[in-house]
Structures are given as structure tokens and as C-alpha cells.
Amino acid sequence: GPEDALKQQLWLGAVNLIFTFVAIYTVDSLGRKPLFLAGTVGMFLGLSILGTTIYTQQMGIVSLLAILLFIGSFAMSMGPVVWVMLSEMFPNSVRSVAMSIAVAAQWLFNAIVANSFPLVNESNLNQNSFNGALPYFIFAFFCLIALVFVWKMVPETKGKSLEEMENLWSTK
């Protein structure tokens, strides 16, 4: 009933808050890249498990735990840490332009996700072949792409000066 929906919403908010604080307190000790990698793996697992529970129509506590895993993983990685890393990786001469492009790209892709989800969710393919799980599998796939991208392409910025970052980019 409504009480269960309220409890679930409280769990979502609590996990989001707790794991945001995990990011705040570990970003300097663990580094940015390890948080990205761990968070992206958690996001992939959360979306994959959720997609599987929807596909098999076995929704219940496992679905809720998968959602909480995704929320917690995002809150400790791609949510807050990306902004720390972006502010550290660009030299002063281009930082404002680079941050503007990053923010614009984020909002563009947020709009794409928000507008594509209902289209994919309501599609005949999704409803007839995937029992409503296709969007979660698609987003899980994008988490894998993000994982490989971070692993191969994103440098660790922890403890690096702006000069070191500038030298890193000029050698690539």
C-alpha cells in the first residue's frame, strides 16, 4: 500500500544520502578513478539485476535491492565525483569553456535518457519480447561502455597538480 511506497522512497533517499557521504569522505583517500570503476560496476549490476527481475516477472525485494544498489553506486561515483574530476583535469586557460561543454553535454544526455525511456518502455519489442525490461538492459550496456571508457581513457587526478594534468594531456 501507500505505506510501502513511502518506506521504499525513504530507503532510496537514505541510500542516496549515505553513499554521497561515502564519496565525499573517500574521494581523496581512494581516488576518483577507483570510485568511478566501483560505482560503474555497481550501476551495471543493479540495472542488470533489475532488468532480470522485470524480465522474469519476479519483482519484489530483489528488485528493490537492485534499485538501491544502482542508487548507491551512482551516488558514490558518477553523481558527485565527476564534478570533482572535471574541475581538476582542465588547465585554467580552458576550464570555464570545458566545464560549460561538460554541463551542456550532461543536460543533453539527461534529456535523451528522459525522452527515450518512455519510447523504449512503451515499444512493442519491449512489451512483447522483454516483459518491460529492455530499457534497463540498454542502460546496463551503457554502464559497461562507461566502465571500459573510464578504465582505459580517464586519468586519475587525485594528488596531481594542474601542471601535471596539463603535461598529461599534452603528451597524449
Task: State each model region's role.
Residues 1-172:
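Alpha-helical transmembrane bundle of multi-pass membrane proteins
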